[in-house]
Structure formats: C-alpha cells, structure tokens
Amino acid sequence: MNLKEIFIKNKCDKATKHRYYELYEQDFNGFKNNEINILEIGTFKGESTQSWLDYFSQAKIYTADTFERVSPEKVPSLKDNRVQWFKVDSTSSNCKENFKNLNIQFDFIIDDGLHTPEGQRLTFENFIDFLKPTGSYYIEDVWMLNRNNNMSHYWVKKHPNDFTIEKYNQLIESINKFKVTEYDFSSKKIPDSFILKINK
C-alpha cells in the first residue's frame, strides 16, 4: 500500500483531513526499508504511529506526548517492539535534557503536537539538535498568521493569547536559521493545513 492508503486504513487525518501524504510519500519512499530513526511529537491515539510502522519496515519509531487525553496503555501501536514512547512536554527544558541522555540522532522529526506558534517554536528549539545533518524536520498544522487573513479566523480569535503576530514571528525567526521550505495544503475550510520543512 502507498502512504495515503495506509493513513486511510489507520484513520489518520494526514490523509482524511489534510493531504500531507503528498509530501511524505515523496520524501519517505526511498527509506521504506531502511533502518532509520523517526521521532513523532504528538501521539494521541496512535493513528500515525501505526502508519509509520506499516510504511517503514525497518524503522525505529520514537513518539512523545503528554498523554493527558489518552493513556498510553490504550494505544495499541505503542506495544510494538519497534516503538519507544515518552510521556513528556515537548516544550519544556527538561524534555531536551532527557532526550540528550538517549544519545540518538533522528532521520526525520515530525511535530504534530501543539499547534500554536510558541509551542511549535519551543518544540523545534528543543529537538533540532537531535536531527541528523541529512535529516528533515516537519512542523505540521502551522497557522501562517501573516497571510490569508488568518488572524481573523474564529479559532485564532478564540485563543488570542496563543495566536499573536509576535509569537508567530518568533517561530519564523527561529526556524529561519536553517533552510525552510513551505508546503501549502490549506483551504478556506482548513486554513492550518500547512507544513514547514526544515533542513540543516
């Protein structure tokens, strides 16, 4: 199966809501049978964790979440021997120290955790050092607040302290120290269907 079919099978919104499979199939296809390390930030019910297991036959999947909404014991994919999970706040300074002790470098890091500018910036700053020089870091569901009248969207207005131009600019400033590529999958219905890909 291709990645879109795998996402759909596992009821993962990277296919059903967003079209992220278009980018990931392109970037990941050459690594399907390689022994690589993937870090996923934001586990939730494990739909994407299971999808990575199904797609990558040899990859080790590391996944991090606060697990405040779903107990890890209730996520079947976390029981796989190729998965290692962490109960952690990806924005905390302690998180970086804990991962430093693991002495692991990742081929791909996918941030599907907090979908706020500050949360994405802090997570990025915590984990970018653990990306291999040839690796790629993906920030999903980015609200591009400087365009498409996104500041007036009801969700943004409902959370005024989380979505500010200042915090958005801080995110952009932080990632712009590296090579950044934008992938716009957004629509009027789903304005945050946007990925920022970062390479060293």
Language-model region placement:
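A short alpha-helical cap/connector motif
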Residues: 1-110, 114-139, 143-200
